[in-house]
């Protein structure tokens, strides 16, 4: 955001863009002799621009946040930066970070959830700056590709084909910008419902099917679903042109030595907010202009609540409206599993098995991650999309991991840990096309309730954090 030090320029700019009364600017300006910090600038900017934001006289409001993952803690951070002082964050588990989960094995942390980022993770960079964390100092990321049937190393995009893949990728983003300007922006408010069609169909419509060869690795193997099932909007918001380029070229990929969870541990330590772990919300009642939140420790009263926990479960403990029940029942999720193990012989590099990144091969390993190259006394993590509807159980997935690792030449020695994630809450194409997002966005602030978290943006930590940042900018 630009900070205007020249008052005349500020008046001219806002007058030209928003056609507001100069007197209003002058009145606001008298609150401070000069604009030297961001809080006063924002106060003036939002007063005269008539945006959704509340003014700073509300900083004593009691704010409750449900969930201490990236979405919840980022919301708390930006509230505190705006001057809010009475913030309570409830987290039902015994740790912060949500799907940023970095346990320890023999003195080093490994990843069971989010593992990487890149320079386009601007909000995460703001969080890191806030907590005094420098550039991520984790191990370098690299990978090879293996055949899903033989385990042999191969190149899924040959030299001759690479030119056509690059050409179609450029064409795809050019058409996207032309037909759906702003499609890659964070959140779904105002996004064309035409982008509710599945991503594979959009590629066919654009006559750019080969871009899927680049998208599939950082999308499907990371648990976000299949190209022919997921609404295209989710793909293009997560993998905008710049982010995809970073992932494909491996240009300055971020990996954190102490894990992604450490980001949120440090943030929770710095925040003045009251962060309550092991505090599952049992009931929320919104009445008489207040929000009453009940846990095992009793009932507390708040002025506002921000829900970053999964919205489809919200009606189980909220006094949910009929519309909340109807709309949140449409949210679906993926069954994403992570297996952690040692091996008898260690690989030198991580690997994708692209042939397993389809519904027909659900339960098979899509990628294994060798986090600490050259250090054999560490764990390998393998990632699998399950399929409970087809009867593929966690035991089936574990069995396939043993088989697939052996096929690749790295027999599993000992299973150390495993996690089944409720992953990427999202909508089916038909529900996205129905205008679900614009309807839910119209509820923001009603009943003193605000909705955030993965489903309102996307399932990676940058998108969820950026949405929380924008939510605070819009309404607080």
Each predicted region: which residue ranges?
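N-terminal amphipathic/hydrophobic targeting modules at extreme N-termini
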Residues: 5-15, 41-44, 48-51
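Mid-domain catalytic core of redox enzymes
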Residues: 82, 283-394
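Conserved flavin/dinucleotide-binding core of flavoenzymes
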Residues: 371-476
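Mobile amphipathic helical/loop "lid" adjacent to a hydrophobic cofactor/ligand pocket
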Residues: 125, 129-130, 134-233
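N-terminal Rossmann-like FAD-binding beta1-loop-alpha1 element of flavoenzymes
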Residues: 61-88
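Glycine-rich FAD pyrophosphate-binding loop
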Residues: 80-104
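Helical element adjacent to the flavin cofactor pocket in flavoenzyme catalytic cores
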Residues: 241-287
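Conserved FAD-binding subdomain of flavin-dependent enzymes
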Residues: 99, 107-139
